[in-house]
A protein has these predicted regions:
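Acidic/glycine-enriched edge-of-secondary-structure segments
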Residues: 1-3, 32-34, 132-135
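Conserved nucleotide-sensing/catalytic segment adjacent to the nucleotide-binding pocket
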Residues: 1-11
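Flexible, glycine- and charge-enriched loops at secondary-structure boundaries
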Residues: 4, 36, 72
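Charge-biased, low-complexity intrinsically disordered regions
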Residues: 4-6, 16, 25, 186, ...
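Inter-motif core of Ras-like GTPase G domains
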Residues: 15-33, 37-69, 81-95
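Conserved GTP-binding G-domain of TRAFAC-class P-loop NTPases and closely related GTPase folds
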Residues: 55, 59-204
Length: 204
């Protein structure tokens, strides 16, 4: 919090460091402490500054490691954190499930159809994943809390994840394409006129 306050009080330095960018991606790796996005306004102020004073188009990307799907309680905690960040930042937002290449590496022959279908339930959070757990493993006190979490996710239906596999160029390009889309990148550019086919034929 102190670091962000210090940064926001030294905007001349920040402006110099940002320099002049033209059609570039500027990636700002923010701290992972969720309280910065849910309990304090420092990140929101920083985002507002980037948009209004420095005229950047901003897209927040929330990253959740794929190992979270091994623990459903941790996974749904991540879903709630993503939802909280989306609501509090109130900007274009994507949620990304990282390290999906490591998931496939656990299987020598790749993922089966059933395994792929199961993973899809985590890309579009399926509240019934909680119901799949063995209730004998859960403390009865948490049953009502689990049901409340499930109901909250169902009511908002805001969170979904894009899978990021660093070994797949297609996966990386999909992420870039989605970021461009939510930021409306390129919409201000002049359309490219098609070539004059008649003149082209005449020159052949």
């Amino acid at each position: 919090i102190y670091c962000f306050d210090y940064l926001l009080n030294n905007l001349d330095w920040l402006e110099t460091e940002l320099g002049e960018y033209d059609n570039d991606y500027l990636v700002i790796d923010c701290p992972g402490q969720i309280e910065l996005y849910t309990h304090f306004p420092v990140i929101s102020r920083f985002v507002e500054l980037m948009q209004q004073q420095f005229h950047f188009r901003v897209c927040a990307t929330y990253l959740l490691d794929s190992h979270f799907i091994d623990d459903k309680a941790k996974y749904f905690a991540g879903v709630l954190s993503a939802m909280s960040a989306m609501i509090n930042l109130d900007i274009s937002h994507l949620n990304i499930m990282t390290k999906m290449d490591l998931v496939a590496q656990h299987e020598k022959n790749g993922l089966s159809y059933a395994q792929r279908r199961e993973i899809e339930r985590y890309m579009e959070p399926d509240p019934l994943l909680f119901a799949d757990q063995d209730e004998s493993l859960n403390n009865a006190r948490f049953h009502a809390l689990n049901q409340a979490v499930v109901q909250l996710i169902e009511d908002y239906s805001m969170v979904s994840f894009l899978p990021l596999d660093l070994s797949s160029e297609e996966s990386i390009n999909l992420i870039f394409s989605c970021i461009d889309n939510v930021m409306q990148f390129g919409e201000d550019e002049e359309p490219v006129e098609p070539k004059d086919l008649e003149n082209e034929d005449a020159n052949e």
